[in-house]
């Protein structure tokens, strides 16, 4: 008697927002994992993917669809598109509002991954609170949310610290992206200008107090700045330390909610760029997408590096995890997008394993599901441990690259 074995088909993958800077960084790495899924469908309202000379188009073996997604107005059209290509996994690298996509996916068997929470009116962190409080509403499939760098990878670091040292008294996410044009001067940003403008000059500055409690500032993040010397000085020597923007961010919200711990994010770009943005905001009363140019490190070569760290404070110690990437080490993308791509691919690999029950997940909840291991295998992460004594820090451990 012959035993028939059912061959499990590889899921077809669609990436929306496929012509963006982050998608470009993901597609540079995706050929390494091309045999993990079936058909690859790249979708964007722009049609410039085929002209990208840095991508291995032959190995990617993709179908490109030039289309603008309009949700919820054209939900049926969107679902029809997913069915037409037999999509099993949807990776969202767009700036489309998140909730309409999640609502649409309730009516189709598709797994979903995104890098951030997008909302036209309101605060992105409020979506995180709502989704954690109402997980059952979107339990029709696996949903991995906020799996980029900030948020995403950094939350895997926090969970690593919690597993090793326990829940801290507070968590501080810090980032200093010193990128600038290699020649001349331009006011640039290395990732989504639209998202940056929203969180720095439209949403009010905020810090998480633990649980779903939030301390809101009266002003926006571009006008709420904090000296980053106290955070970076223990782990990095700089001639001058920047004053970063205190930005409300999804990684703070999910960590605060899941572990009931205060959390905040302080973000700095090149000091000259920040001063220019502050000046523009004071003059205009707002920032616009036209105030910045995308520094892609391709058409516009860049110098500088993106330094991202998280500090976990305990009564007797401070623990840091940090990654730095230099633009000079990247080909076809910039350091920032290369960092984000690690989170996207970690989330995708976790999804493709297929052993997650249907529900909403944030990256700190994927600790034992392979996510952390992929991150540590894909980027150099340093660990610093400092003892606290008389208000000062004394280093007790430094691991140049953890595994």
Sequence positions of predicted segments:
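Helix N-cap at the beta1-alpha1 junction of Rossmann-like dinucleotide-binding domains, i.e.
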Residues: 44-49, 119
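Beta-loop-alpha module in the N-terminal Rossmann-like domain of NAD(P)-dependent dehydrogenases
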Residues: 90-104
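Rossmann-fold NAD(P)-binding glycine/threonine-rich loop
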Residues: 116-141
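C-terminal catalytic/substrate-binding lobe primarily of soluble NAD(P)-dependent oxidoreductases
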Residues: 2-10, 164-403
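N-terminal Rossmann NAD(P)H-binding glycine-rich loop of SDR-like oxidoreductase domains
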Residues: 13-29
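Adenosine-phosphate binding glycine-rich loop
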Residues: 132-180, 343, 348
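Rossmann-fold cofactor-recognition segment
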Residues: 56-72
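Conserved Rossmann-fold cofactor-binding substructure of NAD(P)-dependent oxidoreductases
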Residues: 70-83
């Amino acid at each position: 008697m012959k035993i028939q074995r059912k061959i499990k088909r590889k899921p077809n993958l669609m990436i929306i927002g496929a012509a963006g800077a982050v998608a470009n960084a993901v597609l540079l790495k995706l050929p390494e994992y091309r045999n993990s899924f079936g058909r690859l469908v790249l979708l964007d309202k722009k049609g410039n993917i085929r002209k990208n000379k840095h991508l291995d188009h032959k190995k990617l073996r993709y179908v490109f669809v030039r289309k603008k997604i309009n949700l919820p107005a054209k939900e049926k059209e969107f679902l029809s598109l997913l069915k037409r290509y037999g999509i099993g996994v949807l990776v969202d690298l767009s700036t489309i509002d998140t909730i309409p996509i999640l609502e649409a996916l309730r009516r189709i068997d598709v797994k979903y991954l995104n890098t951030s929470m997008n909302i036209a009116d309101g605060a992105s962190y409020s979506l995180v609170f709502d989704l954690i409080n109402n997980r059952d509403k979107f339990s029709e499939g696996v949903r991995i949310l906020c799996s980029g760098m900030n948020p995403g990878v950094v939350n895997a670091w926090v969970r690593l610290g919690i597993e090793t040292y326990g829940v801290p008294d507070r968590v501080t996410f810090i980032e200093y992206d010193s990128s600038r044009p290699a020649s001349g001067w331009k006011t640039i940003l290395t990732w989504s200008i639209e998202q940056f403008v929203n969180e720095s000059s439209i949403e009010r500055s905020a810090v998480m107090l633990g649980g779903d409690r939030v301390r809101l500032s009266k002003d926006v993040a571009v006008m709420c700045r904090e000296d980053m010397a106290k955070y970076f000085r223990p782990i990095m020597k700089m001639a001058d330390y920047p004053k970063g923007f205190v930005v409300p961010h999804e990684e703070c919200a999910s960590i605060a909610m899941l572990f009931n711990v205060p959390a905040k994010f302080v973000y700095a770009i090149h000091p000259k760029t920040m001063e220019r943005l502050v000046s523009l905001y004071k003059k205009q009363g707002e920032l616009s997408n036209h105030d910045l140019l995308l520094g892609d490190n391709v058409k516009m070569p860049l110098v500088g590096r993106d330094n991202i760290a998280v500090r976990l404070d305990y009564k007797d110690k401070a623990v840091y995890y940090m990654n730095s990437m230099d633009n000079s080490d990247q080909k076809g993308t910039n350091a920032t997008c290369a960092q984000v791509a690690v989170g996207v691919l970690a989330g995708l690999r976790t999804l493709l394993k297929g052993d997650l029950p249907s529900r909403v997940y944030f990256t700190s909840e994927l600790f034992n599901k392979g996510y952390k291991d992929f991150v540590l295998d894909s980027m150099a992460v340093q660990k610093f441990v400092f003892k606290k004594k008389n208000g000062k820090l004394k280093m007790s451990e430094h691991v140049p690259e953890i595994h």
